[in-house]
Amino acid sequence: MLEEEKMKKIEIKRFTVDDIYVSVLKAKLVKHEGGWMRFEEVRKTFEPTGSVLMDALGQVLLEDKGIIAKDFAKAVGAKSWVMSWAFQWLTGMTLYEFLNQYRLKLACEWLTCTDLNIKEIARRSGYTSQSKLTNMFAKRFGCTPREYRKANRPANYAQLYEWE
């Protein structure tokens, strides 16, 4: 039997945007088992992932939602192609794709939980323009940010969430 055949396959956990995502909200209205409700603060940090690279990206995204793959690679002292390979291995997607998913998640939360205008949401989510956000939304969700908001934001959103 070949050595390779004896070796048991090791499953590697793939990292997702959720592993380093930090909510845009300050607080959410939470209903407790006893029926009473109160606002609870939303955590503004992420739990360490165990990956130096993912944790570094999480820290960078807390400060700069608009960072691009090339600049992140430079910041951690890696060549862009090495970073691309590492992210492909860690997440199953390129760093560019990962950053876009992160930004779309931010935008979705802004859209469903606030009354901010689309241009401001694009800016806060790290997009260079409202049209860039709209294009990414169309590709990912098949709708505009405005349509997404209309379909997903609860009527009483202002009573459910606190944001800055």
State where each predicted segment sits.
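Basic/polar phosphate-binding segments, predominantly the helix-turn-helix DNA-binding elements
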Residues: 36-37, 70-99, 124-147
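Terminal helix-turn-helix DNA-binding modules in bacterial transcription factors
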Residues: 89-125, 152-164
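A generic alpha-helix signature
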Residues: 48-52, 78, 102
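…primarily DNA-binding HTH/wHTH and HhH modules…
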Residues: 3, 9-35, 39, 43-46, ...
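Short amphipathic alpha-helical segments, especially helix-boundary/capping motifs
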Residues: 29-35, 44-47, 60, 80-84, ...
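Basic, amphipathic alpha-helical hairpins
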Residues: 38-41, 45, 49-68, 87, ...
